[in-house]
From Swiss-Prot:
Organism for this UniProt entry: Emericella nidulans (strain FGSC A4 / ATCC 38163 / CBS 112.46 / NRRL 194 / M139)
Catalytic activity: Release of any N-terminal amino acid, including proline, that is linked to proline, even from a dipeptide or tripeptide
Record gene name: pepP
Protein's UniProt keywords contain Manganese: yes
Record-given protein name: Probable Xaa-Pro aminopeptidase pepP
GO molecular function: dipeptidase activity; manganese ion binding; metalloaminopeptidase activity; peptidase activity
Amino acid sequence: MTSLDSILADKYPAKAHARRVAEGLKALGHSGGAIYLEAQKTRLIEDNDEPVPFRQRRPFFYLSGCLLPDSSLVYNIDSDQLTLFIPPINPDDVIWSGLPLSAAEALERYDVDNVLETTEVNATLANIAASHANNSTAFAIAEQVSEGTKFEGFSETNFNVLKGVIERTRVVKDSYEIALLRKANDISAKGHIAAIKASKSATNEREIEAAFIATCIANGAREQSYHPIVACGQNGATLHYGKNDEDLIDPVTNRRKDNVLIDAGAEYRTYCADITRAFPLNGKFLPETRQIYEIVLRMQLECIDMLKEGVQWEDVHAHAHRVAIRGLLELGILRGSEDELFDKRISVAFFPHGLGHYLGMDTHDTGGNPNYEDTDTMFRYLRVRGRLPAGSVITVEPGIYFCRFIIEPFLKNPDLQKYIDVGTLNRYWRVGGVRIEDNVHITKDGHDNLTTAPKTIEEVESLAA
C-alpha cells in the first residue's frame, strides 16, 4: 500500500470539519447550538422512471464523508456530538438494489459519533434544544431542508450564515483532502497519457475523450469533475468547447489537423482534478504552435514559482500577462512597449480568462470572492481575489488563444489596432489555443504541484509520436 493509499484508508475527517465550521460560526458571534445538513435527495428524471445522476451535496459531505442519498446530519456544537441519519430499510428497494448500509456499518465507515435512522431527526433536534433550555440556535441551509424537518424548541433557526461559513472553511484543506486531490490528479494524469496515445489512431475528438474517461473509471474514478473538453485545431480557441465530436481530418486538405487541447479531470470521492494539456496530432508541433506553447509554459512555470502563503493572486495573474506580452512581442504579433501594452490591456485579446481558481470538492471551488462586475477587463474573470492561504489548492492555467470573436474587436478599434501586427497574426490563427493547467497546493514554505501529467514539449511529443 502506498503512503497515499494508507492515508486514504483512514476515515474522512468529518468531525474535524464540523469543529472548524463551528469555530467559524463562533467567530461571527454565534455561540453553541446545532448544525443541520441534508444529503442530496434521490430524484427521478421528470419524464421517466430513471434516477437523476447522483451528486452528493458538498456541505453535507464536508461534515460527514458520506455518499449516501436521502441522509442528514446533526452536529451538537456544545457537546461535540456528530450524528449521521440514514434512511430506514425500504423492502421494495431491497428487491431491486439489495440491502443498504446498516447503522453499525455506517458507524464503522464514517467519522461520526452516532448513526440513527432519518425518522429520528426531529426528536434528536428537539432533545438538543431542550438541553439548552430552548435558548439556542439551529443553523441550516434554507434550500436544503426537507419540508418535514422541524426545529422545535430552538429560539432561532438561522438560514443565513452556515453556507458561507462552510464555503470559507473549505478553502483551507487538511492533509486528508490534499491526499484526495492528489489521488484525483494521479488518476487524471493516467487519463491524459491515455488520451494522447489514443489520438494517434483516433479519427474524431470523441475517441480521445473516451480514452480519458475509460482510464479514469478503470483506475477508480467513476465521475468526472466536469464534462471534458477535447478540442482539435481551431476549436481550441473556444475556452469551454463542449462538442467533442469533430473529425480530426480536415475536410478541405484531407490531412490530420495540427493539435488538440484537452481539459479534463477525474473526480475521486467528490474531490476534483482539473488539468489541461495541448499536444500535436502529427507527432510534432508546428513551428507556430511550438512558439505559443513555449510562451504559455513559461507563463505557467514562472507563476507557479511565485506561489507561497500570502501571495497576492492578482499579482500572479498580472505577471502571467506580462510574460505573455513579452513572448508575443518577440514573435512580432504585438507592437509597442511592454508597459504600454500592459496598461492598454492588449494581452486580454489573447489571454481573456483568469489565471486560475480554487479547487476542491467543486472544480470552481468556494471562497474565491470573484468580482465579475470589475470594469478592468484583465481582472474581471479572475475567480480568486486576495491573498492565498496555506492549505488552499489553486489551478494555474495560463493560455494564449487565437479567437476571432475576441481579437477582431481589438483590430477594429482605432486606438488599439496599432498594437497588433495583422500580417504576423495571420500565421497563428490555425494554432487555435494552448492552455496548460496544473493543480497547486499552497504551503507555508511555498507550494506543492499535485499534477504529474507530462507537459514539456519533449514529453508531449514523445507520447504523441
